[in-house]
Amino acid sequence: GSRRLFLTQKTGAVRIVLPGTTPTLTTFYTFAPYTSSECGVLSVCFDPNYITNKYVYIFYTASASEQRIVRLTDNNNVGTNLANIVTGLPTAGANHDGGATGISSDQNGQGWYLYWSIGDNGNGSGVDANMTSLASKCGRARLDGSVPNDNPFFDGTGPNNDYIWARGLRNPFSFSFQPGSEKLWIYNVGTSYETVFQVNRGDH
């Protein structure tokens, strides 16, 4: 209800537009991301208990070979207490990195989960079939970054990457959860046309 607008900037800053007769802009946090091509600070979402814990989650490209989802605490419009939530997410340091993140309850309302989407990292040669990689996948974690054991490809000690929720995504730049049903809709960017998919557990 604060009417603030959070903005991510590719080059590193997360900014807040503060409401008022004349809106003002302030810096919430500044990363030092890898910014080649489609890399950078990519998305932001808020904890369902934000009013109490003030948690803000941010997806960004940490290096030419790694993306991360981190959590900051909103301390009067300043991000503090950075915590790594999910690390080691794949990137080739170029394109099709995806970068969307969001939080939803499961469709039975039993808990809250963190989702993210990553494209094929510019590799169109079947990385979606590689179940050890999160490239070309939608991932799902608990809010602390741990793996839910009801993820569809969970196999404990491997070889699958247990975070995988769905696969076969070329460049899933953004997604949304449908209010009420919590259905996941992923927007997949193409070369000459775009596609929108309703994505369910284990889809390909």
For each of these PLM feature ranges, what is it?
Residues 1-125, 174-189, 194-196:
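Acidic, Gly/Ser/Thr-rich repeat motifs that build Ca2+-stabilized beta-propeller blades
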Residues 21-27, 74-83, 145-161, 203-204:
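Beta-strand initiation motifs
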Residues 112-115, 140-149:
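A structural motif
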Residues 119-124, 155-160, 168-171:
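Flexible glycine/proline-enriched surface loops and loop-helix/loop-strand junctions
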Residues 133-141, 163-192, 197-200:
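Extracytoplasmic, non-cytosolic globular domains
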Residues 36, 93, 157, 164-168:
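Short, glycine/acidic-rich beta->alpha junctions
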Residues 3-7, 13, 151-165:
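Short, surface-exposed polybasic-and-hydrophobic patches located at secondary-structure transitions
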Residues 68-76, 129-144, 198-201:
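Beta-propeller blade signature
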